[in-house]
Amino acid sequence: MYYLSDLSHYAFFTYISVRAGFAFFIALCLSLFLMPKFITWAKNKNASQPIYEYAPETHKTKCHTPTMGGLIFISSAVIASLSCIKFDNIFAISALLCLILFCLIGLIDDLGKVLKKDNHSGLSPRMKLLTQIIAGLICILPLYFSSELSTELFIPFYKHPLFDMEIFAIAFWILVLISSSNAVNLTDGLDGLATVPSIFSLSTLGIFLYLSGNLNYSEYLLLPKIQGLGEVVIICAALIGALMGFLWYNCYPAQVFMGDSGSLALGGFIGFLAIISKNEILLLLIGFVFVLETVSVILQVGSFKIFNKRVFKMAPIHHHFEKVGWVENKIIVRFWMIALLSNLLALASIKLR
């Protein structure tokens, strides 16, 4: 779409905001159109989500719900992005690569579970970690060696970099990518629970990307100046549109689950956005719901191994609330509210620095 301006001699399609808008609606329409067809196909192929044997009783009725919906909304976002971005932008190409690679990892994991009808038959934890590290390196190393990405570490509400991580930045960035990817994966346990917080996180990071990529805005707001970063906003918009199309079918009661192909890709992409916008630490606030879910699992496993006692009735924490009697809809909406508030607070750091 950017290159249409060369043919028409109008600058309309050179604006990031215009192309982001087109990407959003293209992805939304694709997702809304393709998802019901995928649901029908998945039901015919019995490609449903295996339910964890110790899951709350209310989850037993979900055993026939199709999974791998992430493949559709990620594909929709990629197609929309490719139709709108500039192909000579290393940030945009790396971002798309991140989205695709982490989706493929999740897809392999999903297929293992679906084909064997066993929730433990996907990728082993060790293999999943290894593939995530490799995918992370493929996305990060070109940026590092091209000197396009600063290795300085920034903290929220402070305008100057804390210090330069130098070569250690690679290990730190891989940690951020993997942690974010798995955190969203852990959160995806209730209908729409991971979808809406992901939309909030993508929106917040998209704003940071746009401001840091604009030299005037970044200088005025004392944000890191990173030329070319704004192009990734188009991919953010496409993914938000695709997620909204997916949410139409994923809201309670869900007609389709995103599966690991969706959750791992979303988490990896959100982590990547935090890295290139220099918001690695602020990601703890931007993705607060994902952090909360992950910490609950760490506490549960650690407490059981050390003290042989459980902190929660079940982890991740959304299952704990199910066990104490909260209905699923109440948990979902309250977690959405927490995600919204945490992202608004993260946005406040733009001016308060």
Curated annotation (Swiss-Prot):
Domain of life: Bacteria
GO biological-process terms attached to the record: cell division; cell wall organization; peptidoglycan biosynthetic process; regulation of cell shape
Protein's membrane topology: Multi-pass membrane protein
Keywords: Cell cycle, Cell division, Cell inner membrane, Cell membrane, Cell shape, Cell wall biogenesis/degradation, Magnesium, Membrane, Metal-binding, Peptidoglycan synthesis, Transferase, Transmembrane, Transmembrane helix
Compartment annotation: Cell inner membrane
EC number from the UniProt entry: 2.7.8.13
Cofactor: Mg(2+)
Record-linked InterPro entries: Glycosyl_transferase_4, PNAcMuramoyl-5peptid_Trfase, PNAcMuramoyl-5peptid_Trfase_CS
Catalytic activity, reaction form: UDP-N-acetyl-alpha-D-muramoyl-L-alanyl-gamma-D-glutamyl-meso-2,6-diaminopimeloyl-D-alanyl-D-alanine + di-trans,octa-cis-undecaprenyl phosphate = di-trans,octa-cis-undecaprenyl diphospho-N-acetyl-alpha-D-muramoyl-L-alanyl-D-glutamyl-meso-2,6-diaminopimeloyl-D-alanyl-D-alanine + UMP
Gene Ontology terms: cellular component: plasma membrane
The protein's annotated pathway: Cell wall biogenesis; peptidoglycan biosynthesis
One MF term in the entry's GO annotations: phospho-N-acetylmuramoyl-pentapeptide-transferase activity
Transmembrane segments: 22-42, 65-85, 88-108, 129-149, 161-181, 192-212, 228-248, 256-276, 281-301, 330-350
Pfam families: Glycos_transf_4
Top class in the EC scheme: transferase
PANTHER family in UniProt: PHOSPHO-N-ACETYLMURAMOYL-PENTAPEPTIDE-TRANSFERASE (PTHR22926), PHOSPHO-N-ACETYLMURAMOYL-PENTAPEPTIDE-TRANSFERASE HOMOLOG (PTHR22926:SF5)
Function of the protein: Catalyzes the initial step of the lipid cycle reactions in the biosynthesis of the cell wall peptidoglycan: transfers peptidoglycan precursor phospho-MurNAc-pentapeptide from UDP-MurNAc-pentapeptide onto the lipid carrier undecaprenyl phosphate, yielding undecaprenyl-pyrophosphoryl-MurNAc-pentapeptide, known as lipid I.
Family the entry assigns: Belongs to the glycosyltransferase 4 family. MraY subfamily.
NCBIfam families: mraY
Name of protein: Phospho-N-acetylmuramoyl-pentapeptide-transferase
Species per Swiss-Prot/TrEMBL record: Campylobacter jejuni subsp. jejuni serotype O:23/36 (strain 81-176)
Gene name tied to this protein: mraY
